[in-house]
Amino acid sequence: MSDLLSALLLGILEGLTEFLPISSTGHLLIAQHWLGARSDFFNIVIQAGAIVAVVLVFRQRLLQLATGFGQRENREYVFKLGAAFLVTAVVGLVVRKAGWSLPETVSPVAWALIIGGIWMLLVEAYTARLPDRDQVTWTVAIGVGLAQVVAGVFPGTSRSASAIFLAMLLGLSRRAAAAEFVFLVGIPTMFAASAYTFLEMAKAGQLGSENWTEVGVAFLAAAVTGFVVVKWLMGYIKSHKFTAFALYRIALGAALLLWLPSGS
């Protein structure tokens, strides 16, 4: 398989999995066992490509928040987005400076998929007994920020799954409202992560080793695919639970543990 085709497939995979609660990083780590390992910069860039999709899907909401910033409700929502981002940025930077790196084996990803799937089922069962609430509290905002860090530390957890379900558990029980807040927080989070990694690699003189054609193709593939997925998901969760995704995670994690040799 050519490197360009491999990059295209990884971009499509990122777009498909970044916003579904099934872990994009986990799927990319698994896929790279067969499609070839890529740099951290490549992975961050295609994640940023997927975030472009969020900007396009929620462009009207973003415009509303910007033009209506003088209104208390919009202003508080923006401040809570900022708080969630700052928590992720500060705690994430501490974790990064501590030298934490992603595991190179699939087994931890498999376990994270299984545990995350069970967590999703439990939260769905609990919140089903609660009235629908769409108010983002400060507790929800801080929780979402911390959940994003956890997802970054443990691939297979899923940023969207950990953040959306913690938001639901903390009181933002309406799925669409929780997903919207998490996706909007993802915009500055992933763009900041991309910029940080870019500057680090530039200082180290490592950018010359990247194939920019492959990076560009993967970025566009992730953006286009992500746009379609986000539009579909926001409609789907208005009338469906996340149960199907939870069962998929458990099945995939179990299959990986059964089929992959130990140490993989």
UniProtKB/Swiss-Prot annotation:
The EC number(s) given in the record are 3.6.1.27
Q: Which Pfam families match?
A: BacA
GO MF annotations for this entry?
Answer: undecaprenyl-diphosphatase activity
Q: What class of enzyme is it?
A: hydrolase
Example GO biological process term?
cell wall organization
Chief location: membrane
Gene Ontology cellular-component annotations:
plasma membrane
So where does this one cross the membrane?
Answer: 38-58, 75-95, 106-126, 136-156, 181-201, 217-237, 242-262
UniProt KW keywords: Antibiotic resistance, Cell inner membrane, Cell membrane, Cell shape, Cell wall biogenesis/degradation, Hydrolase, Membrane, Peptidoglycan synthesis, Transmembrane, Transmembrane helix
Q: Does the keyword Cell membrane apply?
A: yes
Q: Reaction(s) catalyzed by this protein?
A: di-trans,octa-cis-undecaprenyl diphosphate + H2O = di-trans,octa-cis-undecaprenyl phosphate + phosphate + H(+)
* Localization per record: Cell inner membrane
Give membrane topology per the record. Multi-pass membrane protein
Similarity comment: Belongs to the UppP family.
Task: Say what the protein does.
Answer: Catalyzes the dephosphorylation of undecaprenyl diphosphate (UPP). Confers resistance to bacitracin.
Q: Anything else of interest in the record?
A: Bacitracin is thought to be involved in the inhibition of peptidoglycan synthesis by sequestering undecaprenyl diphosphate, thereby reducing the pool of lipid carrier available.
Identification of the protein by name: Undecaprenyl-diphosphatase
- Tell me what organism the protein belongs to: Stenotrophomonas maltophilia (strain R551-3)
